[in-house]
């Protein structure tokens, strides 16, 4: 009789445990299906975005971060992709780190989730003193192949030569230390300072690197594997791997889902694939074709996808110094309407995405109007533009 009672008690206990697990799983499934993804903006700072080869005359507005994070939160956003540059750290490491820590503390205060993006645009201010920012000057100035001002975009021979050598792990400083090792050391210091903050979600260790030949896909995998292994010694948080540029679907480089997936390391734990979208992904359009390639990359590689930059721009052909035709953003023709914004967010909802970040949030005015979510009044106060309100309203409609 006593044994029967015990057996009955064990059965009831197992039933209760099973029911609890089932309810927990159901709740997690419901939560996953109804919770909006990361929804946010790219945000630029001051000392963390200062190039070595030119002076920035603008002044950081008082309460810039507090006001920005308040406005971002009020617009229904929960995320920031914080853009920083390696060369900015080299220029002023103390101011750089102080600003990063201030960002982390402010994000903690507002409950925002931050991905810290080691950004580069046109490789470096060494190669493009007018517009470029990214890698520090010491990786260029000791080699006559990379003359100052010789061009950092994908169409320039100096940039192509530098990136090809970078993927071969041949770029070195004056002491003979290779660039991969130096970059890993820099990023590990960043991670050690930020990782304990609850607002820190992860790190993008190199945004939109250049690729110049079809054999570089596997070389980029070696680089990504090296960086992931190095950063995994100091963090368990998400690591974001970026798409490459140029994204020309007709080029011999082979911009396909299969090749893009080759960049992803075999250890996929906590890895996210990031890409950018600067156009309307309308049905049967070139932008939709690009988007589908990126989405399929995530499926092949078995990693989440993250739209780390998006907006809508118009491009016009021009001829660069080498006589090549390049497509540059046309500021006057570029714009994004409420209908455009809703269309893009609706398209994003068709996929299981990690999140997205609109390009962008910056107190410095940009010549492309729809790149300005805020502006400054004569007293240095942040004033939301019409594009802030367009984005805010679209978020409310998309994530009711």
Task: Please provide the spans of the model-predicted regions.
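N-terminal Sec-pathway targeting helices
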Residues: 2-13
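C-terminal segment of classical bacterial N-terminal signal peptides
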Residues: 18-29
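Active-site mouth of glycoside hydrolases
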Residues: 35-257
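Extracellular glycoside hydrolase catalytic/binding regions
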Residues: 57, 61-62, 173-353, 372-376, ...
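Acidic carboxylate-rich catalytic motifs and surrounding loops in phosphoryl-/glycosyl-chemistry enzymes
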Residues: 357-363
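Catalytic histidine-centered segment of alpha/beta-hydrolase-like enzymes
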Residues: 367-369
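Aromatic- and carboxylate-lined catalytic core of secreted/periplasmic carbohydrate-active enzymes
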Residues: 377, 381-400
């Amino acid at each position: 009789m006593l044994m029967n009672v015990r057996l009955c008690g064990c059965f009831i206990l197992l039933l209760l445990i099973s029911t609890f697990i089932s309810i927990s799983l159901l709740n997690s499934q419901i939560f996953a299906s109804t919770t909006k993804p990361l929804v946010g903006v790219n945000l630029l700072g001051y000392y963390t975005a200062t190039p070595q080869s030119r002076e920035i005359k603008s002044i950081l507005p008082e309460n810039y971060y507090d006001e920005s994070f308040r406005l971002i939160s009020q617009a229904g956003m929960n995320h920031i992709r914080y853009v920083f540059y390696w060369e900015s750290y080299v220029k002023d490491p103390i101011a750089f780190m102080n600003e990063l820590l201030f960002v982390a503390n402010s994000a903690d205060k507002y409950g925002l989730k931050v991905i810290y993006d080691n950004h580069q645009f046109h490789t470096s201010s060494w190669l493009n003193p007018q517009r470029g920012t990214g890698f520090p000057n010491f990786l260029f100035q000791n080699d006559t192949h990379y003359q100052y001002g010789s061009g950092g975009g994908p169409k320039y021979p100096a940039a192509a030569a530098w990136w090809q050598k970078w993927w071969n792990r041949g770029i070195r400083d004056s002491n003979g230390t290779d660039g991969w090792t130096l970059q890993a050391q820099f990023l590990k210091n960043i991670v050690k300072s930020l990782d304990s903050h609850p607002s820190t979600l992860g790190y993008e260790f190199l945004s939109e690197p250049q690729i110049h030949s079809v054999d570089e896909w596997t070389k980029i995998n070696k680089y990504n594997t090296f960086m992931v292994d190095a950063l995994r010694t100091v963090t368990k948080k998400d690591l974001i791997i970026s798409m490459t540029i140029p994204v020309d679907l007709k080029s011999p480089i082979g911009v396909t889902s299969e090749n893009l997936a080759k960049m992803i390391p075999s250890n996929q734990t906590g890895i996210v694939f990031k890409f950018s979208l600067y156009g309307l992904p309308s049905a049967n359009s070139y932008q939709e074709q690009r988007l589908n390639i990126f989405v399929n990359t995530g499926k092949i590689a078995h990693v989440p996808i993250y739209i780390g930059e998006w907006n809508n721009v118009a491009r016009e052909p021009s001829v660069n110094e080498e006589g090549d035709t390049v497509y540059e953003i046309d500021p006057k023709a570029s714009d994004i309407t409420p209908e455009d914004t809703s269309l893009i967010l609706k398209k994003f909802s068709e996929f299981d995405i990690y999140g997205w970040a609109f390009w962008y949030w910056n107190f410095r005015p940009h010549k492309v109007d729809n790149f300005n979510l805020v502006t400054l009044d004569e007293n240095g106060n942040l004033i939301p533009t019409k594009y802030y309100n367009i984005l805010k309203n679209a978020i409310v409609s998309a994530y009711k």
